[in-house]
A protein has these predicted regions:
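Bacterial N-terminal signal peptides that target proteins for export
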Residues: 1-8
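Catalytic glycan-binding domains that act on GlcNAc-containing polysaccharides
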Residues: 21-192, 198
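C-terminal motif of bacterial Sec signal peptides marking the signal peptidase cleavage site
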Residues: 17-18
Protein backbone atom coordinates (compact mmCIF):
# COMPACT_ATOMS: atom_id res chain seq x y z
CA UNK A 1 0.00 0.00 0.00
CA UNK A 2 2.84 2.35 0.90
CA UNK A 3 4.62 1.57 -2.37
CA UNK A 4 1.39 2.26 -4.27
CA UNK A 5 1.08 5.67 -2.62
CA UNK A 6 4.70 6.51 -3.45
CA UNK A 7 4.21 5.50 -7.08
CA UNK A 8 1.03 7.57 -7.26
CA UNK A 9 2.90 10.56 -5.84
CA UNK A 10 5.59 10.22 -8.51
CA UNK A 11 2.93 10.07 -11.23
CA UNK A 12 1.27 13.22 -9.89
CA UNK A 13 4.59 15.06 -9.63
CA UNK A 14 5.51 13.98 -13.17
CA UNK A 15 2.14 15.18 -14.45
CA UNK A 16 2.53 18.58 -12.78
CA UNK A 17 6.10 18.94 -14.05
CA UNK A 18 5.10 17.99 -17.59
CA UNK A 19 2.22 20.43 -17.63
CA UNK A 20 4.08 23.38 -16.16
CA UNK A 21 7.63 23.12 -17.49
CA UNK A 22 8.79 25.48 -20.23
CA UNK A 23 8.98 23.81 -23.68
CA UNK A 24 12.54 22.95 -24.75
CA UNK A 25 12.47 25.15 -27.87
CA UNK A 26 10.19 28.17 -27.51
CA UNK A 27 11.39 29.67 -30.80
CA UNK A 28 9.76 26.90 -32.82
CA UNK A 29 5.98 26.58 -32.83
CA UNK A 30 6.08 23.04 -34.22
CA UNK A 31 8.42 21.96 -31.43
CA UNK A 32 6.21 23.64 -28.82
CA UNK A 33 3.07 21.88 -30.00
CA UNK A 34 4.79 18.52 -30.46
CA UNK A 35 5.66 18.69 -26.77
CA UNK A 36 2.36 20.24 -25.70
CA UNK A 37 -0.35 18.95 -28.00
CA UNK A 38 -3.11 20.22 -25.70
CA UNK A 39 -1.66 23.72 -26.12
CA UNK A 40 -2.27 23.43 -29.84
CA UNK A 41 -5.89 22.46 -29.20
CA UNK A 42 -6.38 25.37 -26.80
CA UNK A 43 -4.71 27.93 -29.09
CA UNK A 44 -6.71 26.68 -32.08
CA UNK A 45 -9.92 26.94 -30.08
CA UNK A 46 -9.05 30.52 -29.14
CA UNK A 47 -8.38 31.37 -32.79
CA UNK A 48 -11.72 29.87 -33.84
CA UNK A 49 -13.53 31.76 -31.07
CA UNK A 50 -11.86 35.18 -31.33
CA UNK A 51 -10.14 35.17 -34.72
CA UNK A 52 -6.67 35.75 -33.28
CA UNK A 53 -4.06 33.68 -35.17
CA UNK A 54 -2.29 30.97 -33.20
CA UNK A 55 1.08 32.39 -34.22
CA UNK A 56 0.25 35.78 -32.71
CA UNK A 57 -0.92 34.17 -29.47
CA UNK A 58 2.40 32.36 -29.17
CA UNK A 59 4.46 35.44 -30.06
CA UNK A 60 2.76 37.47 -27.34
CA UNK A 61 3.29 34.76 -24.73
CA UNK A 62 6.94 34.32 -25.70
CA UNK A 63 7.60 38.03 -25.28
CA UNK A 64 5.53 38.45 -22.14
CA UNK A 65 6.49 35.40 -20.08
CA UNK A 66 8.79 33.18 -22.10
CA UNK A 67 6.17 30.43 -21.55
CA UNK A 68 6.82 30.50 -17.80
CA UNK A 69 3.47 29.83 -16.10
CA UNK A 70 4.60 31.56 -12.89
CA UNK A 71 6.28 34.57 -14.51
CA UNK A 72 6.16 37.89 -12.66
CA UNK A 73 7.90 41.22 -13.32
CA UNK A 74 11.26 41.41 -11.50
CA UNK A 75 11.20 43.32 -8.26
CA UNK A 76 12.41 46.89 -8.24
CA UNK A 77 15.40 47.64 -6.03
CA UNK A 78 15.97 50.39 -3.51
CA UNK A 79 19.46 51.87 -3.77
CA UNK A 80 20.09 49.25 -6.49
CA UNK A 81 20.42 46.55 -3.81
CA UNK A 82 17.36 46.08 -1.58
CA UNK A 83 14.50 44.07 -3.20
CA UNK A 84 11.34 46.19 -3.37
CA UNK A 85 7.84 45.82 -4.80
CA UNK A 86 7.08 44.64 -8.31
CA UNK A 87 6.20 47.33 -10.90
CA UNK A 88 2.85 45.72 -11.75
CA UNK A 89 0.51 42.83 -10.94
CA UNK A 90 1.34 41.03 -14.22
CA UNK A 91 1.32 37.27 -13.78
CA UNK A 92 1.31 33.98 -15.66
CA UNK A 93 1.66 33.09 -19.32
CA UNK A 94 -0.14 36.19 -20.61
CA UNK A 95 1.22 38.60 -17.96
CA UNK A 96 -2.28 40.01 -17.58
CA UNK A 97 -2.64 42.49 -14.72
CA UNK A 98 -5.25 42.01 -12.00
CA UNK A 99 -7.76 44.58 -13.23
CA UNK A 100 -7.77 43.48 -16.87
CA UNK A 101 -7.96 39.83 -15.88
CA UNK A 102 -11.00 40.50 -13.74
CA UNK A 103 -12.59 42.41 -16.62
CA UNK A 104 -11.94 39.42 -18.90
CA UNK A 105 -13.55 37.00 -16.44
CA UNK A 106 -16.58 39.24 -16.01
CA UNK A 107 -17.14 39.86 -19.73
CA UNK A 108 -16.61 36.26 -20.83
CA UNK A 109 -18.24 34.54 -17.88
CA UNK A 110 -15.09 32.48 -17.38
CA UNK A 111 -15.16 33.03 -13.63
CA UNK A 112 -12.80 30.16 -12.78
CA UNK A 113 -10.05 31.29 -15.19
CA UNK A 114 -6.52 31.43 -13.80
CA UNK A 115 -3.46 33.08 -15.29
CA UNK A 116 -1.26 30.03 -14.73
CA UNK A 117 -3.38 27.90 -17.08
CA UNK A 118 -2.42 28.00 -20.76
CA UNK A 119 -6.00 27.40 -21.89
CA UNK A 120 -7.25 30.49 -20.06
CA UNK A 121 -4.23 32.55 -21.09
CA UNK A 122 -4.71 32.08 -24.83
CA UNK A 123 -8.43 32.72 -24.43
CA UNK A 124 -7.56 35.96 -22.63
CA UNK A 125 -5.21 36.98 -25.46
CA UNK A 126 -7.95 36.24 -27.98
CA UNK A 127 -10.43 38.33 -26.00
CA UNK A 128 -7.99 41.21 -25.57
CA UNK A 129 -6.86 41.35 -29.20
CA UNK A 130 -10.48 41.12 -30.31
CA UNK A 131 -11.36 44.14 -28.17
CA UNK A 132 -8.30 45.93 -29.55
CA UNK A 133 -9.61 45.38 -33.06
CA UNK A 134 -13.00 46.74 -32.00
CA UNK A 135 -11.72 49.73 -30.03
CA UNK A 136 -8.65 50.76 -32.04
CA UNK A 137 -9.52 49.23 -35.42
CA UNK A 138 -6.30 47.19 -35.47
CA UNK A 139 -6.41 43.94 -37.41
CA UNK A 140 -5.67 40.78 -35.44
CA UNK A 141 -3.08 39.99 -38.09
CA UNK A 142 -1.19 43.22 -37.37
CA UNK A 143 1.22 41.75 -34.83
CA UNK A 144 3.18 44.98 -34.34
CA UNK A 145 0.31 47.26 -33.40
CA UNK A 146 -1.63 44.54 -31.60
CA UNK A 147 1.33 44.00 -29.30
CA UNK A 148 1.73 47.73 -28.69
CA UNK A 149 -1.91 47.87 -27.57
CA UNK A 150 -1.44 44.71 -25.50
CA UNK A 151 1.57 46.13 -23.70
CA UNK A 152 0.53 49.77 -23.37
CA UNK A 153 -3.22 49.31 -23.01
CA UNK A 154 -5.97 50.76 -25.18
CA UNK A 155 -5.58 54.20 -23.67
CA UNK A 156 -1.80 54.28 -23.88
CA UNK A 157 -1.61 53.08 -27.48
CA UNK A 158 -1.76 56.58 -28.97
CA UNK A 159 1.54 57.58 -27.36
CA UNK A 160 3.67 54.63 -28.44
CA UNK A 161 5.51 56.42 -31.26
CA UNK A 162 7.58 58.31 -28.70
CA UNK A 163 8.51 55.11 -26.88
CA UNK A 164 11.54 53.45 -28.48
CA UNK A 165 11.47 50.58 -26.01
CA UNK A 166 7.95 49.45 -26.88
CA UNK A 167 8.64 49.92 -30.60
CA UNK A 168 11.62 47.56 -30.35
CA UNK A 169 9.61 45.03 -28.37
CA UNK A 170 6.75 45.16 -30.87
CA UNK A 171 9.19 44.61 -33.75
CA UNK A 172 10.49 41.50 -32.01
CA UNK A 173 6.94 40.20 -31.54
CA UNK A 174 6.16 40.89 -35.19
CA UNK A 175 9.29 39.04 -36.30
CA UNK A 176 8.61 36.08 -34.03
CA UNK A 177 4.99 35.99 -35.13
CA UNK A 178 6.08 35.69 -38.77
CA UNK A 179 8.52 32.92 -37.86
CA UNK A 180 5.83 30.99 -36.00
CA UNK A 181 3.46 31.48 -38.93
CA UNK A 182 5.93 29.99 -41.44
CA UNK A 183 6.66 27.07 -39.13
CA UNK A 184 2.98 26.28 -38.64
CA UNK A 185 2.50 26.17 -42.41
CA UNK A 186 4.88 23.21 -42.42
CA UNK A 187 3.54 21.25 -39.46
CA UNK A 188 -0.03 22.52 -39.07
CA UNK A 189 -1.65 19.72 -41.07
CA UNK A 190 0.07 16.99 -39.06
CA UNK A 191 -0.91 18.67 -35.79
CA UNK A 192 -4.52 18.88 -36.95
CA UNK A 193 -4.69 15.17 -37.79
CA UNK A 194 -2.95 13.94 -34.63
CA UNK A 195 -5.34 12.36 -32.16
CA UNK A 196 -2.91 11.66 -29.35
CA UNK A 197 -2.33 13.95 -26.39
CA UNK A 198 1.08 15.15 -25.26
CA UNK A 199 1.26 17.29 -22.16
Amino acid sequence: MKILKINLLFVILFFISACSSIPSNTSNSCSIFNERYLWFKHASKSEKKWGTPVYLQLAIIKMESGFDWLAKPPRQKLFKVIPYKRPSSSFGYSQAVNGTWEQYKKETGNKLAVRTRFKDSVDFIGWYTSKTESILKISKKDAFRQYVAYHEGWGGFKNYKDNKKIINLAKKVEKQSNIYKKQLLKCGSSLTTNKYIIF
